């Protein structure tokens, strides 16, 4: 964790190579003349010029100040109150808060030749405002486009079953890939999530039919096991009753009681127990 924080701090302090070279060069005679003229203009137009020269940078912002096209020494500045010269100075504000955007649905051909539609969401923030301004024209647009291509490339190497079961692993791989790719832009990709995986209608029907067939097969197996267990129990009960005349008599009386309680209109002709024992003995 400390290594990540240290690398994050180092990345936030990086400055472009071109800025390092330019910072060593002087403004030149013409440059200093223009700067002096700007100071003179501020003085003669004071206090009106104060409204033009004073800029406020909020807590979640950083500002890059250019003087005659060169980034001022120190790179990004803020938050606080800053003074700029008219005509020679310009500034760009960069929002340092976390930004989220949706990856539009992407048509992806999986490794097992199944076409699916996948979308997601990415969370990122600008970690180095100087790199985000100096190294790329539009860091937000570039990150969005790179997220789309990364999503297609990551899912194109996976089977459908892997995509459906390993979403978190795929999202983590995408986050790592995006973070490395946007490092030179001063962007820190914090999180990537896969929102939805849409399958073709025919494939959905086939998977539903397969699942239904599997459920029916399991139900049949359970029913068959129940019948087999019931048959074993009946066989064991018949053997016990055959060996014990008293048990047969009790079962006989219990059956008569049940019939009399449920169907009062039924006429029962009881048979002698000895006859029943003879019948069961002959069958056995």
From Swiss-Prot:
Keyword Transmembrane: no
SUPFAM superfamilies, per the entry: Band 7/SPFH domain
Entry GO CC: cytoplasm; cytoskeleton; cytosol; endoplasmic reticulum; melanosome; membrane raft; mitochondrion; perinuclear region of cytoplasm
Tissue: Expressed in all sensory neurons of the dorsal root ganglia. In the CNS, expressed in many neurons of the spinal cord, medulla and pons. Expressed only in scattered neurons in the cortex, hippocampus, thalamus and basal ganglia. In the cerebellum, expressed in all Purkinje cells (at protein level). Widely expressed with high levels in heart, liver, skeletal muscle and testis and low levels in lung, brain and spleen.
SMART domains for the chain: PHB
Annotated region described as Required for lipid raft association, given as residue ranges: 267-269
Result of changing residue 145 to D: Does not abolish interaction with ASIC3, but abolishes regulation of ASIC3 channel activity
Subcellular location: Cell membrane; Cytoplasm, Cytoskeleton; Membrane raft; Melanosome
Annotated segments matching region Required for homooligomerization: 265-273
Superkingdom field: Eukaryota
Cytoplasmic side: 1-31, 53-284
Topological relation to the membrane, as annotated: Peripheral membrane protein; Lipid-anchor
Alphabetically ordered keywords of this record: Cell membrane, Cytoplasm, Cytoplasmic vesicle, Cytoskeleton, Lipoprotein, Membrane, Palmitate, Phosphoprotein
Intramembrane segments: 32-52
Pfam families cross-referenced by the UniProt entry: Band_7
Region (Interaction with LANCL1): 273-284
GO BP: positive regulation by host of viral genome replication; positive regulation of protein targeting to membrane; positive regulation of viral process; regulation of monoatomic ion transmembrane transport
Sequence positions bearing Phosphoserine: 18, 161, 244
Family membership noted in the UniProt record: Belongs to the band 7/mec-2 family.
Subunit composition and interactions: Interacts with LANCL1. Interacts with SLC2A1. Interacts with SLC4A1; this interaction positively regulates SLC4A1 activity. Identified in large complexes with SLC40A1, SLC14A1, SLC29A1 and AQP1. Homodimer and higher order homooligomers. The homodimer is banana-shaped. Interacts with ASIC1, ASIC2 and ASIC3. Interacts with STOML1; may redistribute STOM from the plasma membrane to late endosomes.
Name the record gives this protein: Stomatin
Annotated source species: Mus musculus (Mouse)
Taxonomy of the source species: Eukaryota, Metazoa, Chordata, Craniata, Vertebrata
Record gene name: Stom
